[in-house]
Curated annotation (Swiss-Prot):
Record's signal peptide: 1-31
Disulfide bonds: C53-C73, C118-C203, C125-C194, C130-C155, C216-C245, C226-C237, C294-C328, C374-C435, C381-C408, C589-C595
Region (V3): 294-327
Organism: Human immunodeficiency virus type 1 group M subtype B (isolate SF162) (HIV-1)
Name the record gives this protein: Envelope glycoprotein gp160
Biological classification of the source: Viruses, Riboviria, Pararnavirae, Artverviricota, Revtraviricetes
Lipid-acceptor residues (S-palmitoyl cysteine): C755
Gene Ontology process terms (BP): clathrin-dependent endocytosis of virus by host cell; fusion of virus membrane with host endosome membrane; fusion of virus membrane with host plasma membrane; positive regulation of plasma membrane raft polarization; positive regulation of receptor clustering; viral protein processing; virion attachment to host cell
Family: Belongs to the HIV-1 env protein family.
Positions in coiled-coil regions: 624-658
MF-aspect GO terms: structural molecule activity
Ranges in the topological domain labelled Cytoplasmic: 697-847
Region V4, residue ranges: 381-408
UniProt region (V1), positions on chain: 130-154
C-alpha cells in the first residue's frame, strides 16, 4: 500500500524568518554607550574652605612684631603662575564672598591674639585731675596752626607701685578725645571707656604698619580671578584666570577713604549691592591714586609708669617745643579731578542729576571723621573740605588749585572694630610722625527719604564696616573646589584583559591644571596626565612650604591664627587627595587616568550624542548637565566593580589562555617537559600492556613467539575455516602487517594502534549508547502513551462517576420534593375540608 504525501508551502515562513533576522541585525547594530571615568578633568564647584596666608619675608622688620603676624605665613612664590581660562564665563559676587568674611574674622583674631599678652589698664580707671596743657613758648609756629585749647590734658593720678599696698602719684598727658569729665568743674576726668570696656595697652614693640598679605587656597582648591576691567562686582565675567594666591592685600584699617589699595585699569568704577537701596554702601575704585601726606608735628616723649608688679603703662611725658595740630595735605587739583570722574559715573548710574557731596551726617568719631593709623598713632581727620561741593553736569567748584589741609585729632583709646566691650590703648610714639599714603578708593552713602529732590543726589562719606575695605580688594576673587573626577559616555566597555604594564603617553604640553577648562571635552589640549600630576605635586610642594614655615616659627604658632590655618590647609589638602584616590580604588581605577566601566549609559541622564558631548561641550558644561545624576552613577560604578571582583576567581582561570604567546613563556618550559615525560611514559606503559596481551594471546593459541615483533596469522573469516597441511588444499594468504624498526616508527605504530583501538571502542560505545537512548526513548514514549491513556481512562471514569452521582442526587431530590409536595397538598386539603367536615357533622347531628 502506497501512502501519498501532502506537499506543504513554507514560503511565508521563509519571509517571516528573513524579516525577523533583519530586525535583529538592525537592533544589534545600534551602538551601546558605557560610563567612562576620567581623572584630571578641569571641573570646579563653588566652595568655602580655610585659606592660609603668604607674605614676603623682607616686607617687615624682624625686630618688630607686627600685629598682622606675617612672620608665621609661608613665603610668597617668586614666580606666581596665573593661567588664563579661555572660553570660560564664570559668575562672581563680591557681596556674598566668603573670602571677605574669612579675612574679617582673621584680622579681628589677629588683633585679639596680638593684644592677649599685653597689659590691661584697669588700674588707670581712677579719677584723673587734669589741666589744659599750654605751649612752652609764646611764639607762633609758621608750619601749622596751634592745637586748640584743651586738646591735650595734663593729668595727675594715683597708681599702685611695685608694692601693692603703696600708692604713688604720677602724671601723664592725655588727648581730649580719650577722657571725659566727671564733675562740672572740668578738673576731674576719667578714661573714656572705663565704664563699658576693658582697655588693653598694645605691647611696646607691636607695629600697626600694614603688610601685604596674600590669601592662598589649599591644594585641591583654586582661586578664580576676574580680569574684566569694568567688572561691577557681581554677574558673569568672561575674562577669567586661575591663581593659587591673591595679590598682596594691605589690611588698612580706615574709614571714608580707602588707602594703599589697588586701582582700576580703565576709569573709575563704582560698585554697590543695590544702587536703588540708599542703605547700601557704594564702593568707589579710582583709576589714579591721590596722595595724602599726614604729619604730627609735635615732638613727643614717652615715659613708663609702673601700675603694679610687672606691669607698665606708657604715656606721653612731655612735648618738646610748641603744641601744634596734626594735619593731612591733599592736592586740591588732583582731588577735584578725581571727584569729576566719580561724578561722571554717578550721573551715568542715577541719571543726569546734580551730584552733591556733603560731610558725614553723624555718629561715632570713626565714621564722622576719616580715621586711619599713621606711624602707630590713630588719626581722626575732619574730611569736610573733601566732601563739600556741588556738581552739575561735571561742573564743580572753581577754586580747585592749592592744597587741601585736613585738621586731624589723635586718639589713643580706640574701639576695636566697633565691638562692644573691647578697647585698645595705643602707646604714644616718640618724636615727630610723618606718613604718606595713596587714596585708591572711597566709601559713599546716598541720602534717601521723601525730602530728597528728584533732581539732586546727595552723597556722604561712609565706612565703619571693615568688610567693605576687604571687599574692595577681594571683589575679583572667588574660591572653587576642584573636582578632578568626571564621568562621560563612550563606546568602550570594561573587559577583563591580561595584566600588563601600560605607559601613559598623553600630551606633554603644560597648560596648567585648569588651563584646558574652556576647551571641548574631546580636544587634544586636555592633558589629563599633567593635571593629575599637578594635584599631587601641588600638595607636596605646598606641604613642604607649610612645614618649613611651621618649623621656623613653631615657637610663635601658639600666638597666631595663621599657624592653625596652615595646619588646617595641610590636613584638608591630603584629605581631598585621599578621597579621590579612595573613589578610584573602589571603582577599580587606581593609577588610571581614563577608566572604562561595565555600567551602561542611561539616556535619561543625558540624551545628547557623542559628537554633541565631545566636540561641542566643555567639561564644566557637561558637569552641569549631569550634576543631578552624579551620585547615582558613582553608586552604579561601585556596584559593578563589586560584581566584577566576585567573578575575579573564575576569570583568573581564563586569564592564562588570553594569549597564545604565553605558551612560549620560558617559565612554562618545565611544565611542557613534564607533560612530554608523562606522554612518553604512558606510551611505554601501553606498549608493555599490548605486548603482554599479545604474548598471552599467542600462548593460548599454542604459539611460542621468538620476539616481540613476531607476527601470528590473522584469524580466517567464518566462511573460510582453517585447516592443516595434511588435509591438503590451497592455502590462503594470511593478513599480516610489516615489522617496524626504530623508536619513532615504533611510537607511531603504537599511537596508530592506540588511536584505532580507541576509535573502535568509542564507536562501539557510542552505538551502544545510541541504541540504549533509542530503546529508552521508545520505551519512554510507550510508557508516556500508556500513562496518557490510563490517565484519560480514569478521567473518563471520574467524569462518568460524577455524572452518575449528580443524576442520583437529582433523582433523590426530585423524589423528596414530590413527597413534600404531596404531604403539603394533603395538609392543605385537610384544612380545606374542615368546613365540609363540620357541616357534615352538623348534618349528622340534626339527623
Amino acid at each position: 500500500m502506497r501512502v501519498k504525501g501532502i506537499r506543504k508551502n513554507y514560503q511565508h515562513l521563509w519571509r517571516g524568518g528573513t524579516l525577523l533576522l533583519g530586525m535583529l541585525m538592525i537592533c544589534s547594530a545600534v551602538e551601546k554607550l558605557w560610563v567612562t571615568v576620567y581623572y584630571g578633568v578641569p571641573v570646579w564647584k563653588e566652595a568655602t574652605t580655610t585659606l592660609f596666608c603668604a607674605s614676603d619675608a623682607k616686607a617687615y622688620d624682624t625686630e618688630v612684631h607686627n600685629v598682622w603676624a606675617t612672620h608665621a605665613c609661608v613665603p610668597t612664590d617668586p614666580n606666581p603662575q596665573e593661567i588664563v581660562l579661555e572660553n570660560v564665563t564664570e559668575n562672581f559676587n563680591m557681596w556674598k564672598n566668603n573670602m571677605v568674611e574669612q579675612m574679617h574674622e582673621d584680622i579681628i583674631s589677629l588683633w585679639d591674639q596680638s593684644l592677649k599678652p599685653c597689659v590691661k589698664l584697669t588700674p588707670l580707671c581712677v579719677t584723673l585731675h587734669c589741666t589744659n596743657l599750654k605751649n612752652a613758648t609764646n611764639t607762633k609756629s609758621s608750619n601749622w596752626k596751634e592745637m586748640d585749647r584743651g586738646e591735650i590734658k595734663n593729668c595727675s593720678f594715683k597708681v599702685t607701685t611695685s608694692i601693692r599696698n603703696k600708692m604713688q602719684k604720677e602724671y601723664a598727658l592725655f588727648y581730649k578725645l580719650d577722657v571725659v569729665p566727671i564733675d562740672n568743674d572740668n578738673t576731674s576726668y576719667k578714661l573714656i571707656n572705663c565704664n563699658t570696656s576693658v582697655i588693653t595697652q598694645a605691647c611696646p614693640k607691636v607695629s600697626f604698619e600694614p603688610i601685604p598679605i596674600h590669601y592662598c587656597a589649599p591644594a585641591g582648591f583654586a582661586i578664580l580671578k576676574c580680569n574684566d576691567k569694568k567688572f561691577n562686582g557681581s554677574g558673569p565675567c568672561t575674562n577669567v584666570s586661575t591663581v593659587q594666591c591673591t595679590h598682596g592685600i594691605r589690611p588698612v584699617v580706615s574709614t571714608q577713604l580707602l588707602l594703599n589699595g589697588s586701582l582700576a585699569e580703565e576709569g573709575v568704577v563704582i560698585r554697590s549691592e543695590n544702587f536703588t537701596d540708599n542703605a547700601k554702601t557704594i564702593i568707589v575704585q579710582l583709576k589714579e591714586s591721590v596722595e595724602i601726606n599726614c604729619t604730627r608735628p609735635n615732638n613727643n616723649t614717652r615715659k613708663s609708669i609702673t601700675i603694679g608688679p610687672g606691669r607698665a603703662f606708657y604715656a606721653t611725658g612731655d612735648i618738646i617745643g610748641d603744641i601744634r595740630q596734626a594735619h593731612c595735605n591733599i592736592s586740591g587739583e588732583k582731588w577735584n579731578n578725581t571727584l569729576k570722574q566719580i561724578v561722571t559715573k554717578l550721573q551715568a548710574q542715577f541719571g543726569n542729576k546734580t551730584i552733591v557731596f556733603k560731610q558725614s551726617s553723624g555718629g561715632d568719631p570713626e565714621i564722622v571723621m576719616h580715621s586711619f593709623n599713621c606711624g602707630g598713632e590713630f588719626f581722626y581727620c575732619n574730611s569736610t573740605q573733601l566732601f563739600n561741593s556741588t556738581w552739575n553736569n561735571t561742573i564743580g567748584p572753581n577754586n580747585t588749585n592749592g592744597t587741601i589741609t585736613l585738621p586731624c585729632r589723635i586718639k589713643q583709646i580706640i574701639n576695636r572694630w566697633q565691638e562692644v566691650g573691647k578697647a585698645m590703648y595705643a602707646p604714644p610714639i616718640r618724636g615727630q610722625i610723618r606718613c604718606s599714603s595713596n587714596i585708591t578708593g572711597l566709601l559713599l552713602t546716598r541720602d534717601g527719604g521723601k525730602e530728597i529732590s528728584n533732581t539732586t543726589e546727595i552723597f556722604r562719606p561712609g565706612g565703619g564696616d571693615m568688610r567693605d575695605n576687604w571687599r574692595s580688594e577681594l571683589y575679583k576673587y572667588k574660591v572653587v573646589k576642584i573636582e578632578p573626577l568626571g564621568v562621560a559616555p563612550t563606546k568602550a566597555k570594561r573587559r577583563v584583559v591580561q595584566r600588563e604594564k601600560r605607559a601613559v603617553t598623553l600630551g606633554a604640553m603644560f597648560l596648567g591644571f585648569l588651563g584646558a577648562a574652556g576647551s571641548t571635552m574631546g580636544a587634544r589640549s586636555l592633558t589629563l596626565t599633567v593635571q593629575a600630576r599637578q594635584l599631587l605635586s601641588g600638595i607636596v610642594q605646598q606641604q613642604n612650604n607649610l612645614l618649613r614655615a611651621i618649623e621656623a616659627q613653631q615657637h610663635l604658632l601658639q600666638l597666631t591664627v595663621w599657624g592653625i590655618k596652615q595646619l588646617q590647609a595641610r590636613v584638608l589638602a591630603v584629605e581631598r587627595y585621599l578621597k579621590d584616590q579612595q573613589l578610584l580604588g573602589i571603582w577599580g581605577c587606581s593609577g588610571k587616568l581614563i577608566c572604562t566601566t561595565a555600567v551602561p549609559w542611561n539616556a535619561s541622564w543625558s540624551n545628547k550624542s557623542l559628537d554633541q558631548i565631545w566636540n561641542n561641550m566643555t567639561w564644566m558644561e557637561w558637569e552641569r548637565e549631569i550634576d543631578n545624576y552624579t551620585n547615582l552613577i558613582y553608586t552604579l560604578i561601585e556596584e559593578s566593580q563589586n560584581q566584577q571582583e566576585k567573578n575575579e576567581q573564575e576569570l583568573l582561570e581564563l586569564d592564562k589562555w588570553a594569549s597564545l604567546w604565553n605558551w612560549f613563556d620560558i617559565s612554562k618550559w618545565l611544565w611542557y617537559i613534564k607533560i612530554f615525560i608523562m606522554i612518553v611514559g604512558g606510551l611505554v606503559g601501553l606498549r608493555i600492556v599490548f605486548t603482554v596481551l599479545s604474548i598471552v594471546n599467542r600462548v593460548r593459541q599454542g604459539y611460542s613467539p621468538l620476539s616481540f615483533q613476531t607476527r601470528f596469522p590473522a584469524p580466517r573469516g567464518p566462511d573460510r575455516p582453517e585447516g592443516i597441511e595434511e588435509e591438503g588444499g590451497e592455502r590462503d594468504r594470511d593478513r599480516s602487517s610489516p615489522l617496524v624498526h626504530g623508536l619513532l616508527a615504533l611510537i607511531w605504530d603504537d599511537l596508530r594502534s592506540l588511536c584505532l583501538f580507541s576509535y573502535h571502542r568509542l564507536r562501539d560505545l557510542i552505538l551502544i549508547a545510541a541504541r540504549i537512548v533509542e530503546l529508552l526513548g521508545r520505551r519512554g514514549w510507550e510508557a508516556l502513551k500508556y500513562w496518557g491513556n490510563l490517565l484519560q481512562y480514569w478521567i473518563q471514569e471520574l467524569k462518568n462517576s460524577a455524572v452518575s452521582l449528580f443524576d442520583a442526587i437529582a433523582i433523590a431530590v426530585a423524589e423528596g420534593t414530590d413527597r413534600i409536595i404531596e404531604v403539603a397538598q394533603r395538609i392543605g386539603r385537610a384544612f380545606l375540608h374542615i368546613p365540609r367536615r363540620i357541616r357534615q357533622g352538623f348534618e349528622r347531628a340534626l339527623l
